[in-house]
């Protein structure tokens, strides 16, 4: 609402130049995937998801200045819903005209019942969204309705548009029997829209959609929004804001939620508690993910450079002992992030696993004590500090003893052959408990610092050996090489001239 109020008062944010780079990337993606058949396990790759994500956000960013006599008295975001404003949107105009209008020409040949390829799917859904039109060609909101005071009428029109974009994706999934194709419905289409109503309208009134194996990510997206309202008031733990469009969360926020709504971990995030959150931002070279950790309430801003499209991810895991156990799977590592391998995507509580944390890295930048070493020029010996007894496993303040999930007892009436089978649910419960105990008992940050210091000491031991050899042998001799730091790749100042 802050955005609409600012617009009403004439406070208009500076509209940035059209990001032609995202349009170019979108065109290349469509060309690359135009002939790629959609099969049962086909999904949209991480790189292509991020290109789609950028296109929708850049379209939103380029909305035109709103006329005083063309504003919604209800606060509805008409700049993204009506032809009056969309046709003035410079990004939209550039997209339609790009490459002699080739994308728009292809779009006009498509309809929802003939799409069979990935490129067709992406172009059709994205162009419906940025054109502000339903599948039948009608606009989300007619220009004559911009200033309407009929709250129920406007809310129903926006709700219909929101449902149509999701219903269309499910229709394609059902026809092709596909599990993982998914784009979502952007944040502004949820203006005064109840997620629970959308979920029940789509799944309860369409018998063909009852098979949740079809359109798994779409189902997971709508189910999550059905149990987590947009404005949670006293229950909110996080709030995302982009261009004045806000959304609050009380659960871990999987990547398919942020991606489907159009939010990014690089947006403004406000924390309402001191519970830790892990903000996943990119893949790393250990087949895992890099994350930033925030502990204090207030504004949490990721200051890292935005990664490339093939590496960037958007997901938040809440570390909160009071999280409802019924929904704790939303924070499981392999569900909170969409795997780049289609066959490994997890989207249901029954199959969610919480493994692989050892491959992830916390990347908050902290100043190390040994960045600048002045001790070489200090004639006084380094004082040995007095010992300070501490627990064998120092813990952060927020690491209270975790509440472990109960493990099912064996059923005494089962046959031996049945009892020795390992239930996947029990395995997931044990794995979850193990991860929580590990976080509780081990200060991973302290271990990381210790590893870093040990590696640095090893480098200085080599430097010292070189100096001794040079001063005692007094003639050239094969000297040991000072290799880059195994963790951060740095070379100590005293060893930079020794690299062979």
From Swiss-Prot:
Record GO biological process: adhesion of symbiont to host via host extracellular matrix; fusion of virus membrane with host plasma membrane
Quaternary assembly: Interacts with proteins OPG094 and OPG143. Interacts with OPG154. Interacts with OPG152. Interacts with host laminin.
Protein name: Envelop protein OPG153
Annotated phenotype, changing residue 48 to R: Loss of pH sensitivity in the fusion process
Transmembrane helix in keyword set: no
Record keywords, A-Z: Disulfide bond, Membrane, Phosphoprotein, Virion
Entry annotated with the keyword Phosphoprotein: yes
Documented effect of changing residue 53 to R: Loss of pH sensitivity in the fusion process
Domain of life: Viruses
Any one of the GO CC terms: viral envelope
Localization per record: Virion membrane
Role according to the record: Envelop protein that mediates acid-dependent endocytosis into host cells. Plays an important role in endocytic entry of the virus by acting as an acid-sensitive membrane fusion suppressor. Low pH in host endosomes triggers conformational changes to allow de-repression of viral fusion complex activity and membrane fusion within vesicles. Also plays a role in bridging the mature virion with structural protein OPG152.
Predominant cellular place of this UniProt entry's protein: virion
Organism: Vaccinia virus (strain Western Reserve)
Mutation effect (residue 441 to A): About 50% loss of interaction with OPG154. Complete loss of interaction with A2
Recorded family membership: Belongs to the orthopoxvirus OPG153 protein family.
Covalent S-S links between cysteines: 43-342
